[in-house]
């Protein structure tokens, strides 16, 4: 019995070590996002997976970047795995601001290789609160204007669409576009020509 007890003890220790290693690996891969108060100030952080299991309990910052090309909005289809508005049309660039990351650095990281192009300067448009039955987000909306097809090709993905304001307006409230986009379009519609001039003008 004593030997059996030792074997069981060793197995328990090995099991705990494996369990802790797996937990540590999982935590390293976890996305940690800031928790904001109602004034938009960071008051802590939480794992994104935990936040998603508690609908609307926490307020998180995200960035969204509209893409303008030849006076049209560049839109792509969101993944079917997206937590909000899966399989709908939206901007190609959107991301959570991670804990201890700035909004500016998140914009650059989200743009990827386009951020290296000196002629592409993200311009801040508006900051607003987005809220539905799942999430509460402080959205920082930016715009970039692409001048060349080469730049456009850098953000090409599947199910791409270049939409004029009129084409988009005709399809609003039909489930085609993401909830974020639906809320932002009225603002974009009133400023899109200004925004294009603002970021593309000489």
Residue ranges and their predicted role:
Residues 1-16, 87-89, 99, 126-128, ...:
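Nudix hydrolase/Nudix homology domain
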Residues 20-64:
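Acidic, metal-coordinating catalytic segment for phosphate/diphosphate chemistry
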Residues 117-126:
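A short coil-to-beta-strand element that immediately follows conserved catalytic motifs
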């Amino acid at each position: 019995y004593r030997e059996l007890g030792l074997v069981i003890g060793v197995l328990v220790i090995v099991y705990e070590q494996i369990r802790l290693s797996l937990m540590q690996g999982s935590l390293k891969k976890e996305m940690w996002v800031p928790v904001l108060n109602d004034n938009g100030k960071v008051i802590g952080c939480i794992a994104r997976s935990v936040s998603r299991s508690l609908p609307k309990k926490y307020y998180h910052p995200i960035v969204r970047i509209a893409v303008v090309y030849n006076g049209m909005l560049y839109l792509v289809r969101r993944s079917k795995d997206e937590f909000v508005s899966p399989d709908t049309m939206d901007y190609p660039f959107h991301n959570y601001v991670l804990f201890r990351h700035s909004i500016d650095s998140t914009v650059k990281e989200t743009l990827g290789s386009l951020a290296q192009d000196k002629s592409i300067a993200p311009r801040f448009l508006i900051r607003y609160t987005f809220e539905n039955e799942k999430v509460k987000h402080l959205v920082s909306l930016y715009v970039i204007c692409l001048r060349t097809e080469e730049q456009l090709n850098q953000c090409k993905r599947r199910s791409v669409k270049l939409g004029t304001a009129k084409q988009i307006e005709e399809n609003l409230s039909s489930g085609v576009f993401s909830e974020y986009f639906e809320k932002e379009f009225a603002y974009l519609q009133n400023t899109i020509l200004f925004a294009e001039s603002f970021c593309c003008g000489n």
